[in-house]
């Protein structure tokens, strides 16, 4: 057995973490020969619930789980970690504006960024799920200068999975036959699911689904509003699907990308090939090489419709950045 991989998870008593922790501990992500150490973070008043989750995980007797520790101090949770999965964040309450939510969560991600900076491995990879995840990720990044800026990601993999499902459903094929699905921009209602560059059975989407009106309206809006639809139907936000997408996002980053494919993740826009303003956490199509290096896929074409939508999501991210500019170290 190799040395254990240390993974920190914030929001450990929440529903996403509950759907995630057992799968991580089982070895699903890193395989049957890799030990795992889980370091789970929660706010003090949720530690009792988290203790119950810890007991359940212990009762599974996972052979690959080297240890599980729980705490309310990010400086303990993030010590010497290889990965941080930042799930915990304040949710939007009644009457709360997006600006209010950003301000509330900025405090959390300033603190967590500083803790990562102080005690995490400099090579640690950070995945932000807590919303608004793009700008929360930017805040954490700007408070962790000792970590590599290119190793901070906000999750748009759930949006990619949703888009993949809707395209497969419409074309009546398996989801495995849908590829090269890109989510551009923000993980919000302005996100842009790209049907122009996606493929179904290795063919351009529009040759299989020649209904431009459905693609421009029904498809895009269904992806953009899927989270809200789940809340309306279930009374709670996405949890198991978000956990599954987070595992997908980590797998995307860890393993080489198959030839001719790519995945979506939001990362720092500096030096991107599409003219998106720098200093944003923006979702792009990406690939990982055999040596583990991640790069943005270049050369994808935007038609006028796609370009207009992408400019809107870029503008929203610029506005979010401005809302928290007073606490960003830029």
Swiss-Prot record:
<dbReference type="GO" id="GO:0030060">
    <property type="term" value="F:L-malate dehydrogenase (NAD+) activity"/>
</dbReference>
<dbReference type="InterPro" id="IPR015955">
    <property type="entry name" value="Lactate_DH/Glyco_Ohase_4_C"/>
</dbReference>
<dbReference type="GO" id="GO:0006099">
    <property type="term" value="P:tricarboxylic acid cycle"/>
</dbReference>
<protein>
    <recommendedName>
        <fullName>Malate dehydrogenase</fullName>
        <ecNumber>1.1.1.37</ecNumber>
    </recommendedName>
</protein>
<comment type="function">
    <text>Catalyzes the reversible oxidation of malate to oxaloacetate.</text>
</comment>
<feature type="binding site">
    <location>
        <position position="112"/>
    </location>
    <ligand>
        <name>NAD(+)</name>
    </ligand>
</feature>
<feature type="binding site">
    <location>
        <position position="131"/>
    </location>
    <ligand>
        <name>substrate</name>
    </ligand>
</feature>
<comment type="similarity">
    <text>Belongs to the LDH/MDH superfamily. MDH type 2 family.</text>
</comment>
<keyword id="KW-0520">NAD</keyword>
<feature type="active site" description="Proton acceptor">
    <location>
        <position position="187"/>
    </location>
</feature>
<feature type="binding site">
    <location>
        <position position="92"/>
    </location>
    <ligand>
        <name>substrate</name>
    </ligand>
</feature>
<keyword id="KW-0560">Oxidoreductase</keyword>
<feature type="binding site">
    <location>
        <begin position="11"/>
        <end position="17"/>
    </location>
    <ligand>
        <name>NAD(+)</name>
    </ligand>
</feature>
<dbReference type="Pfam" id="PF02866">
    <property type="entry name" value="Ldh_1_C"/>
</dbReference>
<dbReference type="InterPro" id="IPR001252">
    <property type="entry name" value="Malate_DH_AS"/>
</dbReference>
<dbReference type="Pfam" id="PF00056">
    <property type="entry name" value="Ldh_1_N"/>
</dbReference>
<dbReference type="GO" id="GO:0006108">
    <property type="term" value="P:malate metabolic process"/>
</dbReference>
<feature type="binding site">
    <location>
        <begin position="129"/>
        <end position="131"/>
    </location>
    <ligand>
        <name>NAD(+)</name>
    </ligand>
</feature>
<dbReference type="InterPro" id="IPR036291">
    <property type="entry name" value="NAD(P)-bd_dom_sf"/>
</dbReference>
<feature type="binding site">
    <location>
        <position position="98"/>
    </location>
    <ligand>
        <name>substrate</name>
    </ligand>
</feature>
<dbReference type="InterPro" id="IPR001236">
    <property type="entry name" value="Lactate/malate_DH_N"/>
</dbReference>
<dbReference type="InterPro" id="IPR001557">
    <property type="entry name" value="L-lactate/malate_DH"/>
</dbReference>
<dbReference type="InterPro" id="IPR022383">
    <property type="entry name" value="Lactate/malate_DH_C"/>
</dbReference>
<keyword id="KW-0816">Tricarboxylic acid cycle</keyword>
<dbReference type="InterPro" id="IPR010945">
    <property type="entry name" value="Malate_DH_type2"/>
</dbReference>
<feature type="binding site">
    <location>
        <position position="162"/>
    </location>
    <ligand>
        <name>substrate</name>
    </ligand>
</feature>
<feature type="binding site">
    <location>
        <position position="105"/>
    </location>
    <ligand>
        <name>NAD(+)</name>
    </ligand>
</feature>
